[in-house]
């Protein structure tokens, strides 16, 4: 036994896929009887779509979803506006030859989880449901994990324990790390999946009485389903019962309409908005990822995306350490992901308080394509003349001279060394790819670019020795 993962949501499943495809044995435990049934985290960012492309599930994700629909805003029965996601949130979405997935993709979370679980099983893994972590102890070389499966206790011995068990993480609480931040006690968010009669077209239907979106009831079309996801924010004292009748009354109260009839309530949840983050992502051999490490408002759709990318950052590093890389490689997980989580916390909180009001400052960047690890210890750039692309940045896609996409070359568990005319050193288990400089790759012919397994640039240099020294630190 090598790794125990607590939690079979998008974070835990992504991490399990990353480990099992590298030959790392792991046990994925979840206290629920099955996968999460709701649509909750439904918007996949361009960067998350790239992660799923690398995992080999892009076709399933594409067929299971649709482009993010526009918002249709109603004042009673009248349609008063139709706006894109870009217009509603004041964001921008980059495009170009280096970006294969230029927009957000709408996939209900239950479907994303199903696709990830199917992929995990193809890699030889699985999930143990009705099984929860109830305690653990760790030594310098191992962690012992106490679990309860259907009431029966079991003691597991593992190299590492990863808490990917959500905002109420048992692993985090037992680990005893700080979880500072704020809770918005004066408000609640109601969310669920329901069928609705009386609506036409694929939109996010924003129901209001007078066109003012601050008091709204939203219904999102869900692809591949007859259900809608509904969302409504409210004061704590106005929370209704979690029943179909109460939600139906809320629709009438918010919209002034009785022609929209709800039925078949599949899932419903009421939650307090928190903006909190741990002060440590790892303590010894216990690691936190996703909502177990940071929670925030759903505004801007950053939660699932940030969590998946936590797992993607951690997976290759954890596997490398298990195979013999220096353990301090794991320190770079917190070094790189904690600033990202802090930034997302601030962004989502700002969007939450704005409540669709226009931004007063720069447009919020929701696509996550600009996340960079520049300045971190795994970003080495010793060139004298540096262009726009730097070590620590995401490696852009490109069309190669042979007609193949660069992302097709990067896909997999390996490092890739990009050359632009210079003689590349021969390195075992590193893919060598010849390229031509371009606006996205504004480099000289003597530049070497080493791309990490997670698609970020580890090295930009003109020295083969720099590449070899870097690899000695990470493999």
From Swiss-Prot:
GO cellular component: cytoplasm
Enzyme class at the top of the EC tree: oxidoreductase
Record carries keyword Zinc-finger: no
Principal location listed in the UniProt entry: cytoplasm
Gene3D superfamilies cross-referenced by the UniProt entry: 3.30.70.2450, 3.40.30.120, FAD/NAD(P)-binding domain
Inducers of expression: Expression increases >200-fold after exposure to tetracycline, doxycycline or inhibitor anhydrotetracycline but not tigecycline; expression is repressed by upstream TetR (MAB_1497c), is not under control of whiB7. Probably part of the TetR-TetX operon.
Disulfide bonds: none
Notes on how activity is controlled: Inhibited by anhydrotetracycline.
Keywords per UniProt: Antibiotic resistance, Cytoplasm, FAD, Flavoprotein, Monooxygenase, NADP, Nucleotide-binding, Oxidoreductase
UniProt-listed Enzyme Commission number(s): 1.14.13.231
Catalysed reaction, written as an equation: a tetracycline + NADPH + O2 + H(+) = an 11a-hydroxytetracycline + NADP(+) + H2O; tetracycline + NADPH + O2 + H(+) = 11a-hydroxytetracycline + NADP(+) + H2O
Record Pfam families: FAD_binding_3
Disruption phenotype annotation: Cells are about 2-fold more sensitive to tetracycline and doxycycline, but remain sensitive to tigecycline, a broad spectrum glycylcycline antibiotic.
Gene Ontology molecular-function annotations: FAD binding; oxidoreductase activity, acting on paired donors, with incorporation or reduction of molecular oxygen, NAD(P)H as one donor, and incorporation of one atom of oxygen
Function: An FAD-requiring monooxygenase active on some tetracycline antibiotic derivatives, which leads to their inactivation. Hydroxylates carbon 11a of tetracycline and some analogs. Confers resistance to tetracycline and doxycycline via an oxidoreductase activity; probably monooxygenates the antibiotics. Does not act on tigecycline.
More info: Although it has a similar activity to Bacteroides TetX it is phylogentically distinct and is thought to have evolved by convergent evolution.
Protein's UniProt name: Flavin-dependent monooxygenase
Source organism per UniProt: Mycobacteroides abscessus (strain ATCC 19977 / DSM 44196 / CCUG 20993 / CIP 104536 / JCM 13569 / NCTC 13031 / TMC 1543 / L948) (Mycobacterium abscessus)
Gene: tetX
């Amino acid at each position: 036994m090598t790794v125990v993962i607590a939690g079979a949501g998008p974070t835990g499943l992504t991490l399990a896929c990353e480990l099992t495809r590298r030959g790392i044995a792991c046990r994925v435990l979840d206290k629920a009887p099955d996968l999460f049934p709701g649509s909750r985290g439904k918007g996949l960012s361009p960067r998350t779509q790239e992660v799923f492309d690398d995992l080999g599930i892009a076709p399933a994700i594409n067929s299971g979803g649709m482009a993010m629909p526009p918002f249709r805003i109603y004042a009673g029965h009248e349609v008063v506006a139709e706006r894109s996601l870009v217009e509603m949130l004041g964001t921008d979405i980059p495009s170009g030859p280096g970006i294969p997935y230029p927009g957000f993709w709408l996939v209900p979370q239950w479907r994303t989880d199903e696709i990830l679980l199917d992929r995990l099983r193809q890699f030889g893994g699985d999930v143990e449901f009705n099984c929860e972590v109830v305690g653990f102890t760790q030594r310098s070389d191992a962690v012992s994990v106490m679990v309860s499966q259907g009431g029966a206790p079991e003691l597991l011995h593992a190299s590492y324990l990863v808490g990917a068990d959500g905002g109420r993480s048992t692993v985090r609480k037992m680990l005893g790390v700080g979880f500072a931040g704020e809770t918005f006690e004066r408000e609640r968010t109601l969310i669920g999946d329901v069928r609705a009669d009386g609506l036409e077209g694929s939109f996010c239907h924003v129901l209001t009485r007078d066109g003012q979106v601050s008091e709204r009831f939203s219904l999102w079309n869900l692809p591949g389903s007859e259900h809608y996801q509904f969302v409504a924010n409210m004061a704590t004292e106005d929370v209704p019962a979690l029943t179909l009748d109460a939600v139906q009354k809320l629709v009438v109260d918010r919209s002034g309409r009785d022609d929209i009839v709800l039925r078949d309530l599949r899932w419903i949840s009421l939650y307090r908005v928190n903006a909190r983050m741990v002060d440590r992502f790892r303590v010894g051999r216990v690691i936190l990822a996703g909502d177990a490490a940071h929670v925030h408002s759903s505004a801007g759709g950053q939660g699932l995306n940030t969590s998946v990318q936590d797992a993607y950052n951690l997976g290759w590093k954890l596997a490398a350490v298990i195979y013999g890389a220096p353990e301090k490689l794991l320190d770079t997980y917190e070094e790189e992901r904690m600033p990202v989580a802090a930034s997302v916390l601030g962004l989502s909180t700002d969007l939450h308080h704005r409540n669709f009001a226009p931004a007063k400052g720069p447009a919020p960047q929701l696509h996550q394509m600009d996340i960079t690890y520049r300045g971190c210890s795994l970003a080495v750039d010793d060139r004298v003349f540096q262009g726009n692309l730097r070590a620590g940045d995401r490696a852009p896609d490109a069309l190669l001279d042979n007609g193949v996409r660069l992302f097709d070359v990067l896909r997999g568990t390996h490092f890739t060394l990009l050359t632009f005319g210079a003689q590349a050193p021969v390195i075992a288990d590193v893919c060598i790819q010849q390229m031509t400089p371009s606006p996205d790759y504004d480099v000289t012919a003597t530049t070497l670019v080493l791309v990490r397994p997670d698609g970020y640039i580890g090295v930009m240099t003109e020295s083969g020795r720099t590449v070899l020294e870097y690899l000695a630190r990470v493999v």
